[in-house]
A protein has these predicted regions:
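Active-site SXXK
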Residues: 2, 25-51, 79, 134-138
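A penicillin-recognizing enzyme superfamily signal
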Residues: 4-7, 12-18, 32, 78, ...
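Structural recognition of the beta-strand scaffold that forms the well-ordered cores
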Residues: 5-7, 50-52, 78, 90, ...
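Short, contiguous acidic/charged loop-to-helix segments that flank catalytic cores in large enzymes
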Residues: 12-14, 18-30, 66-67
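Secondary-structure transition/capping motifs at alpha-helix termini
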Residues: 13-15, 41-49, 110-112, 140-145
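Generic, well-ordered alpha-helical scaffold segments in large soluble proteins
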Residues: 39, 43, 82, 90-94, ...
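Conserved catalytic neighborhood of penicillin-recognizing serine enzymes
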Residues: 45-100, 144, 156-179
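Mid-domain, small-residue-enriched loop/turn segments at the edges of structured enzyme/sensor domains
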Residues: 62-65, 96-133
Length: 179
């Protein structure tokens, strides 16, 4: 439901109140491929679709796999499980880099997202809390999840001063995409 059980935003709040979990931006790397595959599924791909892991080029950019090898023909499920860079690049190109960026925004990414081809490999900087929100939404069957840290505040007499009110979750993608 979005409850944050623990968060470490820094090592010493007195020295620096900057919360790296909610404020800092970092490149998410392969975790970003979630949005590439969600966009592909929404565009009609299915996990058993066959794709080819092979050298590809988009303009001057030639993505490589981390192991330096290519697997040839594989299914999408395997490409996602093994985080195959060339397949993610091909999917992003086919569905559109703007479509991938839109999917990321639908799942809670609030930072600006580039639409350059390399974005499919996580080169756009994002906040950790946004990535957490997105992955939680997938775990919730595609329903939005808003992170929160305080559930209730009472006074010494037990009177409720604040009670977290869960917002109505909305569907961020079709049921078959995240479900």
């Amino acid at each position: 439901d979005g409850a944050v059980l623990a968060m470490v935003g820094g090592t010493d709040y007195v020295r620096s109140s900057y919360n790296r979990a909610t404020e800092a931006v970092r490149q998410p790397g392969s975790a970003w491929k979630l949005f590439v595959y969600l966009a592909a599924l929404e565009a009609g791909y299915v996990p058993d679709d066959r794709v080819v892991d092979e050298p590809v080029q988009f303009g001057d950019w030639r993505p490589r796999n981390s192991n330096g090898r290519f697997a040839g023909e594989i299914d999408l499920r395997t490409a996602f499980a093994y985080s195959i860079n060339t397949v993610a690049a091909q999917l992003g190109n086919e569905v559109g880099f703007g479509t991938v960026a839109s999917m990321a925004r639908r799942f809670g990414i609030t930072t600006p997202v580039s639409t350059y081809p390399s974005m499919v490999l996580g080169t756009s900087e994002v906040r950790l809390i946004d990535m957490t929100r997105a992955f939680a939404a997938v775990g919730a069957g595609g329903r939005s999840v808003e992170p929160y840290g305080i559930t209730k505040v009472t006074d010494r007499d037990g009177e409720v001063l604040y009670q977290h009110d869960a917002r109505q979750a909305y569907q961020q993608g079709p049921d078959y995409v995240a479900g």
